[in-house]
Amino acid sequence: MQFLWLCLLSAVTLQFTGTLAFYPIKLPDFTKGIISHHGSVGRRFFTFPGLYKHAHTGSTTLNIRRGPSNYRRDNNYPAQIASPPTAPNTLGINNDGYDFSYFSEVKVGSEGQKMWMLIDTGASGTWVFGSDCTSKACGRHNTFGKEDSKTIKVTDEKWGVTYGTGKVSGVIVNDTMSFAGFELVTPFGSASTASDDFLNYPMDGILGIGPQDPNAKTPTVVQLLMQQKLLKSNVIGINLQRASEGATDGQITFGDIDKSKFSGELIYSNVVPNGYQWEIAMDDLIMDGKSLNLKGRTGIIDTGTSFLILPPADADLIHSMIPQADKGSGFYTLPCSTKVDIKLSIGGVEYTIQPDDYVGNETATKGTCNSLIVGRQILGPKQWLVGDVFLKNVYSVFDFDKNRVGLAARKYAGTKNPPSSTPSPGMFLLHAIHCQKTISVLMLHIDPTSNKAPSGGSPGLPAESGSDSTTNGEATNGATSSPNSSSSVLTPTWLTLAVFFAIGSSLWS
């Protein structure tokens, strides 16, 4: 297995101690036909063909004062901007309009340079594009450097993230980051070079909020918040919005839980033993009421991953339950009208995955869409990468003190088909072997010459029953845990940001 690490580096001499990787996926053909979603056509517009079947045709409509709108930065990346949050220590999460990447505005340096930062629970490292970067990709993003801040301290410590097809690299800098009511002095990576792979990415950097390897020498952004006792409690609550619903209430809350964003109670699952990711045990997958008996699986809960990515054998089984699903050239397609009820059972609760979230855009064959459940062997034989296809349906809580993940059914106020969760007949306690120490990036690649829209593109041990109740009506289940300007609109002819995640420990010492 090849490796990749997205990491916040310490202010000491850093050396690579592992192999780094990038996983491209070539998807089948597409058409430029767009299917309207089932909601109000007037609520949302895109300026180019959508990746999901609910995108619209039509010219850009800007509504500055009210309702969801397609706000556009000087560097011409589209976004569905989140409504200003009302809860304290909360940051709005913007959507790229396709539910593929979620990012927030962070102010960096003494002058408050605005940067769009990918919210990534799959990595603990933080970095931005540096103003000294001359790469083409940097010219299409907001950058940050000496001219933007009086307080920046540039070190000579090298930093880099390498992909199979390119890389981003530079040095470590120290400066302030302001977000969600906090102002924090922190080290982070400043990219002086970046490959063309970043040309169409909306984000100007990554804000890593994954758990840190306890052996790492440098604290992460979240660790600094905790060390300085700036958080009410050492938890982070996240709800992602679904673009097709016209929702703009995506947000991340630092130090608290927003109970208005979910229904029912939060059910917690402990992170697998010795895991340095938000990896938890999963019970099963249920389709139209039938258990697939997918026992012993674990899932890495990752906001930086667009899809539900799982071993090919599991993907084959799931699609065998969907009428007329076809593997074709290696990536599944299914009828655009698919309404199969899919529930992922975690911690004894079945969480619905809406068809709008797993059915992608239409292919060259009328009435046939791409599946956003992707079979790809990038982890262990029983490890899943549980991304936004699932996370749009839940409110997720990441508890750093108790090393656990909490989930509850997401509440979409005033929208159609709200997600639901159903208690399972029994609780399961799944133990999982520690995941391979690998770090990977998976992206869906579309032919750059095409003008067609892309699609929304460790072995387990036997299960045993058991659950532990906690206070405040919560329950716990699981294994015991130890902008620069561009002259033209950037059309995403290849998928901009499918997956950013990190598994294991730091590749630097």
UniProtKB/Swiss-Prot annotation:
Signal peptide (UniProt feature, chain positions): 1-21
Residues of the Peptidase A1 domain: 102-408
PROSITE patterns membership: ASP_PROTEASE, PEPTIDASE_A1
Propeptide, residue positions: 486-509
BP terms from Gene Ontology: proteolysis
Extent of Polar residues compositional bias: 466-480
Designated name of the protein: Probable aspartic-type endopeptidase CTSD
Lipid moiety-binding residues (GPI-anchor amidated serine): 485
Enzyme Commission number: 3.4.23.-
Glycosylation, residue list: 174, 361, 484
GO cellular component, one term: plasma membrane
Entry keywords, A to Z: Aspartyl protease, Cell membrane, Glycoprotein, GPI-anchor, Hydrolase, Lipoprotein, Membrane, Protease, Signal, Virulence
Topology with respect to the bilayer: Lipid-anchor; GPI-anchor
Lineage: Eukaryota, Fungi, Dikarya, Ascomycota, Pezizomycotina
Pfam families assigned: Asp
Family note: Belongs to the peptidase A1 family.
Active site: 120, 302
